[in-house]
Amino acid sequence: MTVVRTLEGRRALITGANQGLGLAIAKAYVQAGASVMLCARDAAKLAGAQSDVAALAAADQRVCVMRADVAVPDDVSALMAATLEQLGGLEILVNNAGVYGPMGPIESIDWAEFTRAMDININGSVLPMRAVLPHFKQQRYGKIVQLSGGGATNPLPRIIAYAASKAAIVRLAESVAVDVKDFGIDVNSIAPGALNTRMMDELLAAGASAVGEAFYKRMASLAESGTTPLEVGASLAVYLGSAASDGITGRLISAPWDPWESLHDHRVELASSDIYTLRRIVPRDRSQTWGDK
């Protein structure tokens, strides 16, 4: 199959890139022509990821890695400096790093685990954004691709840290998108669908007693019958990093359910509406009149 190199010459920083969706995105980016900086906390897995991704790269592409904790300001500052030095510039940030955090009733989950999950999922997105935006503003161009999840749009009882933090980063991305729209910077979030990754394994290992019987059964069924392929979310990440998506910003886009391949044909409608955003639903949105004052 011929891969269209829509990211030819572009440079990307991808967090949480040592496994799962982050690794799939890294591979897709290199196949699309980009040079990449991969970061994660596990140096050993990161080295393995570098080898796998580099095997897909052409001679003129760079595949660099750096161990970093994206929730630690000094780590992120050093990561940004290394990225600019080793890649020679940067056009794309993919914020993929994230964790489920503790699972169980909110009154009994471990508080340190809860705050750590919130730190990784929220600050681990804010800090890389803060690091890249001065560079993006100076060059008046950039792409920020934020990974979201089911917790952003639906309640996830007993997976509170994940749900709350995912909702937070979607609103973060939308707010930053408005703030930087005059600099040619696009900021979008991806809902990748249910993925058969380490995080799914953690959820199933926690068991029904931790995550609730109904949710556990639904996830176990998905794991057996078919989750969303990693390549689907990775392909959307490529699209949102490419010139084809220029001007599409502030959106939460579902990789398996939205017709994202043709969103560039609807830039005007997107820019003038709240399509693909988080909003409060009022009665009239459901053809009810009793809610109007």
Provide a role label for each language-model segment.
Residues 154, 175-185, 244-246:
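Active-site-adjacent segment of SDR/Rossmann-fold oxidoreductases
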Residues 107-126, 141, 145, 169:
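Catalytic Tyr-X3-Lys loop
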Residues 77, 100-115, 138, 158-161:
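Conserved mid-core segment of classical short-chain dehydrogenase/reductases
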Residues 129, 165:
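Active-site helix of classical SDR
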Residues 11, 18-19:
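Conserved glycine-rich cofactor-binding loop
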Residues 189, 211-293:
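C-terminal helical subdomain
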Residues 43-44, 67-79, 111:
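The beta1-alpha1 cofactor-binding region of Rossmann-like NAD(H)/NADP(H)-dependent oxidoreductases
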